[in-house]
Amino acid sequence: MATVLRIDPETLPRTLALDPPVTDAEFEEMCRGNRMGIRLERTKDGVVRMNLPTGGWTSSANAVITGQIGNWQVAHERGRAFASCVAFCLPDGSILSPDASYVSEERLKTLPKGGLRGFPRVCPDFVIELVSESDPLQKVKDKMNDWIANGAQLAWLIDPYQRQVLVFRPGRDAELISGDCIAGEGPVNGLVLDLARIWQCYED
């Protein structure tokens, strides 16, 4: 009779430092073998971060965000929008997953044929991260700065608990915005994100 190993994700460490660090190929294989719904990322220093599955509020809000960006991308017929299940191999050696993202046609053309089949070796032009209750705010802010440092032109950190958005841009301080909508610029000029629909996801 087979032995069933039961692992409580809550008891797992949040970071895993391996020596030597896992290679890109090993990390991708690790992600494919993950059966617990844990989202894995690798920092530029080779540390593997484990992010637990989200609750219903955050999952619902993610769906609303991804849907709006996807609809905008289809209407404008340019670039590609991505959901939270993708991981990008970034120039500094890290492999990170945003909650939602957009890659312009120009950057997509830098990928080799089949470059989207695995983890794309490109930094998104635009990323969104959604604060969850388990996220230390400074940790998420640091991740936003990592996106910008790797080439993102615009990054939104959405905090549904404070009902506000921190906007990150290259070479500028983060800008705090509150309200029921936020307008895109640069690579996502014309995008208007309905924040009110996101706030509603956090109401039972």
Could you describe each region identified by the protein language model?
Residues 1-204:
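Gly/Pro/Ser/Thr-rich low-complexity, intrinsically disordered segments predominantly at protein N-termini
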